[in-house]
Amino acid sequence: MFLVIGAILASALFVGLLLYHLKFKRLIDLISYMPGPPVLPLVGHGHHFIGKPPHEMVKKIFEFMETYSKDQVLKVWLGPELNVLMGNPKDVEVVLGTLRFNDKAGEYKALEPWLKEGLLVSRGRKWHKRRKIITPAFHFKILDQFVEVFEKGSRDLLRNMEQDRLKHGESGFSLYDWINLCTMDTICETAMGVSINAQSNADSEYVQAVKTISMVLHKRMFNILYRFDLTYMLTPLARAEKKALNVLHQFTEKIIVQRREELIREGSSQESSNDDADVGAKRKMAFLDILLQSTVDERPLSNLDIREEVDTFMFEGHDTTSSALMFFFYNIATHPEAQKKCFEEIRSVVGNDKSTPVSYELLNQLHYVDLCVKETLRMYPSVPLLGRKVLEDCEINGKLIPAGTNIGISPLYLGRREELFSEPNSFKPERFDVVTTAEKLNPYAYIPFSAGPRNCIGQKFAMLEIKAIVANVLRHYEVDFVGDSSEPPVLIAELILRTKEPLMFKVRERVY
């Protein structure tokens, strides 16, 4: 009996290995035409990444593309997993410009325990329906109301910066921690309509849970040792993730239930109008309110549906904005002439009274600040790598891409290609001035918010928040970089772009 069972299991194992071998051999044969670095058995190119410090990943991707790619296309094997890196805007347009490649790459699975099937990771009909529902949340009338929240968060940020200015003086301090708490405050209030006061209570359970889950996501997505669920679930990191997820999900769920009950009591549970004249006009609405008053196929969204999207909004609008702001202040601190122009524009538009709120209309008049933000996002895109999964064999501009391939597109690499941007390592905000520049920009060469149908739905929100915080900081302080400005920061391209070492700044109060 046991011999029979053993024979059956051995046969099944043999058949499974044979099928896997044939599938793997097919991949190798189909992609044999594409250039790539020399490979090792079993690990492929994994030895270039396993056990190496995170900042080496950026160098390695640039090195591979510059050394081995042909027409800006390159294959990279991570074990049996085939990845194709693309750096040609024409190829990028095919991948991002249609819904043919709508599925995110496998690395995004690490987000599912927190975001479930929120807009970032959902696909197909569910993604299309949710996108349609969420779009009105970024209508200009609602964005106008969010500026009040940005103003409040900026005031708390200035208070903390002043404390550090007095405490550290010329030695400087890291702006990132305060900026990160500021964006957490603003995103939480705009998403859920509640204040968590992260800037005054950084040790709260919710704030710590957000920090924990961000750390977990970085490690899971870019450490091959945490990629496999069976082994990952046995690690202390998995236990920390579970604890943090319980805090985050319970907090969001509680707010959803409370707000749904409030709307019922107010008699306002009808579907909100999407008409331009009505959206956001009646009351200050949080992102949560839009979802609570929305329907899919004439049915209201469940609490789980809403939690997925609120958590996604929290995730997408928190660390990304912090990263953009940190690199913005680095750029203008190391380019005093640009900082001077930003300050003069802000003072000209907003006036000399530092207590004057910076309104939506005023923010839209900050044209040079806008150019500096765009140039910062070219050099330091908050999301340095985008991924798509190929579900069936296809051709992209004559190149055969087999089913099962992960396509990698790096906004960071695209933004530093000399063929696309003159002097790509130089901070030149004027290159984005469509009135004065002769430089013609391929729309798929500059993709800090991705591009196409799955572009970042909140990019106008993000730009508005960045400019609001910048305007408030620069009219109060002159920002100087503490360090060697001749050496660019060493970058770590994880889920969100960051630096190997914290960027340190000192600030001087502006008197006028």
From Swiss-Prot:
| Protein keywords | Endoplasmic reticulum, Heme, Iron, Membrane, Metal-binding, Microsome, Monooxygenase, Oxidoreductase
**In its keyword annotation, does this UniProt entry include Ion transport?**
no
Coiled coil start-end:
none
Record GO cellular component, one term = endoplasmic reticulum membrane
Q: How does it sit in the membrane?
A: Peripheral membrane protein
Where, in this chain's numbering, is heme bound? Answer: E316, C456
Q: What is its main location?
A: endoplasmic reticulum
* CDD domains per record: CYP4
Cofactor requirement: heme
Q: Which domain of life is it from?
A: Eukaryota
Compartments, record wording: Endoplasmic reticulum membrane; Microsome membrane
Q: Please name the InterPro entries in this protein's record.
A: Cyt_P450, Cyt_P450_CS, Cyt_P450_E_grp-I, Cyt_P450_sf, Cytochrome_P450_Monoox
SUPFAM superfamilies xrefs = Cytochrome P450
A GO molecular function annotation here is:
monooxygenase activity
Checking Pfam families in the record gives:
p450
Is-annotated flag, keyword Glycosyltransferase?
no
Q: What is its EC number?
A: 1.14.-.-
Task: Return the PANTHER family for the record.
Answer: CYTOCHROME P450 4D1-RELATED, CYTOCHROME P450 FAMILY 4
**Recorded family membership:** Belongs to the cytochrome P450 family.
What's this chain's function?
Answer: Involved in the metabolism of insect hormones and in the breakdown of synthetic insecticides.
Q: What is the protein named?
A: Cytochrome P450 4d1
Q: Which organism is it from?
A: Drosophila melanogaster (Fruit fly)
Q: Which gene encodes it?
A: Cyp4d1
